[in-house]
Each structure stands twice: as C-alpha cells, then as structure tokens.
C-alpha cells in the first residue's frame, strides 16, 4: 500500500500532493503522515492503481505541535505458543468494511470460531481480492456476509492492528490488518443471513441504534462506533 498526502494549505486552486510513501509493515498511515511533517485531517479515497497497488489518499495539514501518534506495538493472539526458532510469515492485509445503517438500525456481524475473537461483533467486510477496487470489495463482502444490498458513501476511517497469530488456515503470521472503513446505507433492509458459510462470519443481525452499546464488540470496532454513532 502507498500513502499519499494532499494539502490545501498552499493557497492554490486545489489540493497539492505533499508526500507519497509506502506503508511499511506494522506502521499506521497517521504515523507516515506525521513523520513526513503532516497531520491527518481525514481520509479521502482508497483506489487500486494500474500497477496493482492500493493507494490511500489523505487530506493533511502541516504539523502544529501535534505529538507523534501512538503505536501500540505488535501484539500476540491469546494463548499462542511459539515453537523455538519459529519465524512468522510477514503479511500485510488491506481490507474494506462498511458501517451500514438502515431504518432497522446498524448492520453487525458476529465473528466465527475461525477467528481469534469468536462471539465478538464487528462490521461486515473483509479482504480485498487481487485486482479488486476497495469499494467493490466492501460491496461484495457485505453481500456475502449479510445478504444485504447497500449504497456506499465516503471513506471515514483507516484502522490498523499488528499482531502475531495463526491465520484461519493455521499459518503462523506476523500480521498487519489495514482496515478501510466506509459509511453505507441499506435502502431495503431484509433479514440478514450469512451466504459465505464456514468462513469468518458466524451470524449477522440488524441492531437498533439505541442498543448497539450492549453488544460485545471487538475493541477497535467499539472505539470507532463510539466516534461515528449517536
């Protein structure tokens, strides 16, 4: 993934590109911006270029005393035991998710026992296939995990996590998740059902907005929803 910063602070007729850097494994895009002398105002777009690389474009402004964003470091799956001399496979995975609202509330998905957080809840979405645009990926994933048709809105957040654990296939990985999070609406909500049976999604449901804090969310999703929802 490549991270590009655009600034409107030069007085020109439109945003100016002020940096473009590759996202080093384990690093957050906000740290990339800070180390280049900028702070993130908001994410703008995420697109796959002709060379196959995903480019994340951020609106930024010059640093004005902001501290370097905190990076929690590399975690580890609970209960994971590393054999002596084990070398995890380094993997950076870019995925796309949607915070979907409808007249029935918030669309939520429950993680299956193929994940490290079975029984916890998150947003529908998942990995971006080779050659696929992030916006197309999130529409596909929402359909596979919930059987809903949604209308995508703006990119609202970029989250990263970094840990050592085992993939659903059992591979030991030094894994960085980069999550592109969009807003979306569902004009014609129906009863959710998981079409991709046997994957990382156990179930899906509509949650009335007043009740969303009662679910057992993963930490990252709970934090994000607290900033986006009433």
Predicted regions and their residues:
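Intrinsically disordered, low-complexity, charged terminal extensions of DNA damage-control enzymes
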Residues: 1-56, 60
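N-terminal strand-loop-strand
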Residues: 1-18, 82-122, 150-154, 186
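The catalytic Nudix box helix
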Residues: 22-41, 123-156
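Acidic, metal-coordinating catalytic segment for phosphate/diphosphate chemistry
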Residues: 47-99
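Acidic pyrophosphate-coordinating catalytic loop
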Residues: 48-55, 87-89, 159-179
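Short, well-ordered beta-strand micro-motif
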Residues: 59, 100, 181-185, 205-208
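Phosphate/ribose-recognition catalytic cores of enzymes acting on nucleotide-derived substrates
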Residues: 175-190
